[in-house]
Amino acid sequence: MKLSLVISTSDAAFDALAFKGDLRKGMELAKRVGYQAVEIAVRDPSIVDWNEVKILSEELNLPICAIGTGQAYLADGLSLTHPNDEIRKKAIERVVKHTEVAGMFGALVIIGLVRGRREGRSYEETEELFIESMKRLLELTEHAKFVIEPLNRYETDFINTIDDALRILRKINSNRVGILADTFHMNIEEVNIPESLKRAGEKLYHFHVADSNRWAPGCGHFDFRSVFNTLKEIGYNRYVSVECLPLPGGMEEAAEIAFKTLKELIIKLT
């Protein structure tokens, strides 16, 4: 397992980011602390000079493992299940832009809040629109890989658990789509986290960590030892990305505490 830090472009509105703002500063922080990659949350890829980011990534020898898309929903109201056809089309077009960036770095594209909410519609109707949009994204992108992130009920009422995501994956039926599991959301929604991760198995393509209070891992009461033992058991050897509030003590301290906590867990697994 390799450790990554979630950072963002300066226009991010999402609070649960250890580092928000200048990408260079975020990437330099990640490298200095010891992270092996960064994950970048970005609202609109067209406003970032990705050639400069690529140069910086190579300069720091710091890969970009995933691209977050949720700001397109939070800031611009774009979603893959929006009842308005034109807005849904714009959401697909925006995510295609994210895939183009991801292709520059061999990164995953995260489908979190950009999938939207039910907004009074049935689960089945929302799911049908989502599957239609995901299949369209697969048609429009030749090599892009996506991960669907189950989110807790307070953020969305659509795809809250790993089982919800697995059911949709079976209907999409593509090895280019997997699951992103997040300890913060699982702590709210899953009945038995280790068993849920075992059901995800080889479809688990990415992993987010924050403690029970969404602070840095090590600052709450989440049982990381049990979860990391399960990750080892299912053969998970991909990235573990820290996506937490800049607490305690600000962005740098949160990044440092998280890294120390997780590194010790990984060492004990070997």
Curated annotation (Swiss-Prot):
Give the GO terms filed under biological process for this record: inositol metabolic process
Which keywords are on file for this protein? Carbohydrate metabolism, Isomerase, Manganese, Metal-binding
Swiss-Prot/TrEMBL catalytic activity: 5-dehydro-L-gluconate = keto-D-tagaturonate; L-ribulose = L-xylulose; D-ribulose = D-xylulose; keto-D-tagatose = keto-D-sorbose
In terms of Gene3D superfamilies, this protein maps to: Divalent-metal-dependent TIM barrel enzymes (3.20.20.150)
Q: What class of enzyme is it?
A: isomerase
Name the EC number(s): 5.1.3.-, 5.3.1.-
Q: Where does substrate bind?
A: E155, H185, R214
Pathway assignment reads:
Polyol metabolism; myo-inositol metabolism
Temperature dependence is: Optimum temperature is about 80 degrees Celsius with L-ribulose as substrate. Is hyperthermostable, with an apparent melting temperature (Tm) of 102.4 degrees Celsius.
Tagged with keyword Ribosomal protein? no
One GO molecular-function annotation for this sequence? metal ion binding
**Cofactor remark:** Binds 1 divalent metal cation per subunit. Mn(2+) is the most efficient metal cofactor, but can also use other divalent metal cations such as Ni(2+), Mg(2+), and, to a lesser extent, Co(2+) and Zn(2+), but not Ca(2+), Cu(2+), and Fe(2+).
What is said about its interaction partners and assembly?
Answer: Homodimer.
Its biological purpose is as follows: Catalyzes the reversible epimerization between 5-keto-L-gluconate (5-dehydro-L-gluconate) and D-tagaturonate, and thus probably functions in a myo-inositol degradation pathway together with IolG, IolM and IolN. Is not active on the enantiomer 5-keto-D-gluconate. Was also shown to be a nonphosphorylated sugar isomerase with broad substrate specificity in vitro. Is able to catalyze the reversible C3-epimerization of L-ribulose to L-xylulose, D-ribulose to D-xylulose, D-psicose to D-fructose, and D-tagatose to D-sorbose, with a substrate preference for ketopentoses rather than ketohexoses.
**PANTHER family, per database record:** 3-DEHYDRO-D-GULOSIDE 4-EPIMERASE-RELATED (PTHR43489:SF7), ISOMERASE (PTHR43489)
Record-stated family: Belongs to the hyi family.
The protein in question is named 5-keto-L-gluconate epimerase
